[in-house]
Amino acid sequence: QSTVHIVGDNTGWSVPSSPNFYSQWAAGKTFRVGDSLQFNFPANAHNVHEMETKQSFDACNFVNSDNDVERTSPVIERLDELGMHYFVCTVGTHCSNGQKLSINVVAANATVSMPPPSSSPPSSVMPPPVMPPPSPS
């Protein structure tokens, strides 16, 4: 059975007080193929645009994206494809102030999902070396 996820729950789709609000909201949820996201926002205040790439999402780079912007609340986005999906508000500086959501969509019959990666993992950090356990003395 599919689930409708109300983005931001009672907060809705708005410029959050914390830039991590939407990533924290998504962290505790499993998004499956066939589910939907519902974005609720005041008329003319916000919009919803699905970004093509993580790079565009991270940079809030939505040049030439006017064609695909949904402006009438509530916006329902059906999750039909596996993998990462990136949603932003293209109004003013809303995206750069944290009004953006990335989610990982898993198969409808998946039993366990991994949490999505953090929005900006460090690229130059090496994992710590694996040390053998001390030998018993």
Curated annotation (Swiss-Prot):
At the top level, the lineage of the source is Eukaryota
**MF terms in GO:** electron transfer activity; metal ion binding
All copies of domain Phytocyanin, residue ranges: 3-107
Q: Which UniProt keywords apply?
A: Copper, Disulfide bond, Electron transport, Glycoprotein, Hydroxylation, Metal-binding, Pyrrolidone carboxylic acid, Transport
Q: Which residues form the signal peptide?
A: none
Q: Where does Cu cation bind?
A: H46, C89, H94, Q99
Q: Where is this chain glycosylated?
A: N109
List of residues that carry Pyrrolidone carboxylic acid: Q1
Name positions with the PTM 4-hydroxyproline. Answer: P115, P116, P117, P121, P122, P127, P128, P129, P133, P134, P136
In which residue ranges is the amino acid composition biased (Pro residues)?
A: 114-137
What intrachain disulfides are recorded? C60-C95
Query: Residues annotated as region Disordered?
Result: 112-137
Q: Which Pfam families match?
A: Cu_bind_like
State what protein this is by name. Answer: Cucumber peeling cupredoxin
Q: Which organism is it from?
A: Cucumis sativus (Cucumber)
Upper classification of the source organism reads: Eukaryota, Viridiplantae, Streptophyta, Embryophyta, Tracheophyta
